[in-house]
A protein has these predicted regions:
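Residues at secondary-structure transition points
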Residues: 47, 51, 63-67, 128, ...
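N-terminal Rossmann-like dinucleotide/flavin-binding domain of flavoprotein oxidoreductases
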Residues: 1, 48-108
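Rossmann-like dinucleotide/flavin-binding elements
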Residues: 3-40, 134, 140-175
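Glycine-rich beta-alpha-beta "Rossmann" dinucleotide-binding loop(s) and their flanking helix/strand
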Residues: 105, 114, 118-141
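Short, hinge-like loop/turn segments at secondary-structure boundaries
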Residues: 52-57, 133, 156-157
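Core beta-strand elements of the Rossmann-like FAD/NAD(P) dinucleotide-binding domain
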Residues: 7-10, 103-113
Length: 175
């Protein structure tokens, strides 16, 4: 998609490129709707940090979050969806001629429908000493990417629910 400041118009604009946003892109584009997916980060959202997702439709044996995101992206792209990454949505307005989203560096995009699939953010521990080490030994949801670097180290997982257990199991293969 060419970067320009002139407003473009899409039938469907999806904010977020995690599993929910990618699913919306597949369905919208497969129905022939001009579809644009915008994400302030990259492809897959938090799902990319999961080594195994077992509760997603169509994958009874599970799939890695990264692979799920890549396959969904390819499927949406085949149907004609467009993608813009590293763009933050700074404004959403309803005007007399439709909905308009303003992107950080891209300008305005018009759409008949805007779907917000912004996902979630990791709950931080809130300990200043740990925050200073973020990415330098302290990771939030980084089990997949950080695991090989943990070889021979003691690893501690703080958190609950399914994703913490999956991270602990995945990290145990390396640490």
């Amino acid at each position: 998609l060419e970067m320009r400041r002139v407003p473009i118009t899409k039938r469907v604009l999806v904010v977020g490129a995690g599993p929910a946003g990618l699913s919306a892109a597949v369905y919208g584009a497969s129905e022939g709707f001009s579809t644009l997916v915008v994400d302030e980060g990259g492809l897959g959202g938090q799902a990319t940090s999961s080594s195994l997702i077992r509760n997603y439709l169509g994958f009874p044996r599970g799939i890695s979050g990264r692979r799920l995101a890549q396959q969904a992206y390819e499927q949406a792209w085949v149907f004609g969806a467009n993608f813009v990454f590293m763009q933050r949505v700074t404004d959403l307005r309803r005007e007399h001629d439709g909905l308009f989203v303003t992107l950080s560096d891209f300008g305005r995009v018009g759409a008949r429908a805007v779907l917000l699939a912004t996902g979630a953010s990791y709950r931080r521990v809130g300990v200043p000493a740990l925050e200073a080490l973020n990415g330098l030994g302290v990771f939030y949801g980084g089990a997949v990417s950080a695991a090989p670097a943990m070889a021979g180290h003691d690893v501690y997982v703080l958190g609950g629910a399914n994703s913490a257990g999956q991270s602990a199991l995945h990290l145990s293969r390396y640490a």
